């Protein structure tokens, strides 16, 4: 999540999901 800009997180939350563990992802 921290590696991607917030705009990209909104566009493709799956990327942040792949980059960081599931429990640590605030979007999930």
Swiss-Prot record:
Keywords: Seed storage protein, Storage protein. GO terms for molecular function: nutrient reservoir activity. Residues 1-28 are annotated as: Disordered. Developing endosperm. It comes from the Eukaryota. Sulfur-poor seed storage protein. This is C-hordein. It comes from Hordeum vulgare subsp. spontaneum (Wild barley).
């Amino acid at each position: 999540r921290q590696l991607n800009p917030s705009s990209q997180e909104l566009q493709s939350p799956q990327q942040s999901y792949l980059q960081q563990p599931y429990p640590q992802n605030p979007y999930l």
